[in-house]
Curated annotation (Swiss-Prot):
The keyword Glycosyltransferase does not apply. It holds the Pfam family Phytoreo_Pns. This is Suppressor of RNA-mediated gene silencing. Coiled coil: none annotated. Suppressor of RNA-mediated gene silencing, also known as post-transcriptional gene silencing (PTGS), a mechanism of plant viral defense that limits the accumulation of viral RNAs. Belongs to the phytoreovirus non-structural protein 10 family. One of its GO terms (biological process) is symbiont-mediated suppression of host innate immune response. The lineage of its organism: Viruses, Riboviria, Orthornavirae, Duplornaviricota, Resentoviricetes. It comes from Rice dwarf virus (isolate O) (RDV). It comes from the Viruses.
Length: 353
């Protein structure tokens, strides 16, 4: 499926800068102005500027958006670059990795900037920067840094992108100031677009809706697959809310703030799924990037409403048995009209299994 790369990059740039612009500037500023050399072997401690920006980074660390080694003052600094900025998608952490796992070698102070999941579709579009092959996702990062007047490379820090694709030999890819020519058009596969849609829904379910914080009664990660349906438009969600609450009174809970329909009271591994979520990424990105024919293809039986729109992802849980396995599947208005998405739960009202 062909897409205009400038439109793709611009949309994701606007999304990220609108919601995270001040935070991004603050992270770059703190990394730039923290002088690690003032921490080591200084009887009077660090200077006031370094202490102030360390405090900012520690605040980001409490929100899981930065990493600082615990023994900074005792570290021997053997080279100039011990600080970094890392751009990454949040789904990388949901699979079980920690921020420490994403650190470039030798880095002891790092700030993390999270980009939209759908932006990583560009990971599979390679471009040449000098004699090195890089994912087109770096174009988005460079555009963000330039528009916010942030330097990607400083005298004591570097910027990296944690790329999920294995096509570039390593996950951590250095983002330099070097210019390169973006291709005007890029070919994206329907499968890649659907996979990133599922990851985007996964992040929304885990971080914003926080649906995994309280699992259904009787749920066991080792035995049960948690199923979530994603819908692309508000009207479809409203239809499902109205019909299911009317059909099974007392069996559903609708959160109209987070736009999610929960099933409550029972749980069975044989149920089709356990929640319905409005995927906002469709309206904010995909709906603008493609023409109507492409949108029909993407949302039809060969795309999100078919096998390409069904994925199993994991969430690192607090259960002793390990991670929660989650299956994501998308439905469109046509699918809802043709069949009832929820199974009949009448026989299960007496308890859970």
């Amino acid at each position: 499926m062909e897409v205009d790369t400038a439109t793709f990059v611009r949309l994701h740039h606007e999304l990220l800068c609108a919601h995270e612009g001040p935070s991004i500037i603050s992270k770059f500023d703190a990394i730039k102005k923290v002088k690690l050399g003032t921490l080591a072997n200084q009887s009077g401690g660090a200077n006031n500027i370094t202490e102030a920006f360390l405090a900012k980074l520690r605040n980001f660390e409490r929100k899981s958006e930065a990493y600082l080694a615990s023994d900074l003052a005792e570290r021997e600094l053997t080279r100039d670059t011990h600080k970094a900025i890392v751009f990454v998608t949040k789904s990388v952490l949901l699979g079980g990795k920690s921020l420490k796992d994403l650190l470039p070698y030798g880095v002891i102070v790092c700030a993390f900037i999270f980009i939209p999941e759908t932006a990583s579709v560009l990971d599979n579009v390679p471009v040449m920067i000098g004699n090195q092959k890089r994912p087109l996702t770096v174009a988005l990062i460079k555009y963000i840094a330039k528009s916010l007047n942030c330097d990607l490379v400083g005298d004591s820090y570097d910027t990296f992108y944690y790329c999920n694709s294995s096509a570039y030999g390593k996950n951590l890819i250095s983002v330099s100031d070097n210019d390169f020519s973006n291709p005007q058009r890029a070919l994206l596969s329907v499968g890649d677009l659907c996979y990133q849609a599922a990851r985007s829904l996964h992040v929304a379910a885990a971080n914003y809706i926080r649906i995994f914080d309280r699992m259904p009664p009787g749920f066991q990660p080792s035995k049960h697959l948690f199923r979530i349906i994603g819908v692309l438009d508000m009207e479809t969600l409203k239809t499902m809310v109205t019909s299911n609450i009317a059909r099974e009174p007392g069996m559903f809970c609708h959160d109209n703030v987070k736009d999610v329909l929960h099933r409550i009271g029972v749980y069975s591994p044989n149920h089709h799924f356990s929640a319905v979520i409005l995927w906002r990424g469709w309206a904010s990105t995909y709906a603008y990037m493609f023409n109507q024919e492409q949108l029909n293809m993407l949302s039809g039986t060969s795309g999100l409403a078919g096998d390409f729109g069904k994925y199993k992802l994991t969430y690192g849980s607090t259960f002793d048995e390990g991670v929660i396995h989650v299956q994501y599947q998308f439905v469109t208005p046509e699918v809802v009209r043709k069949r009832n998405i929820y199974p009949d739960l009448s026989a299960l009202k007496g308890g859970s299994s």
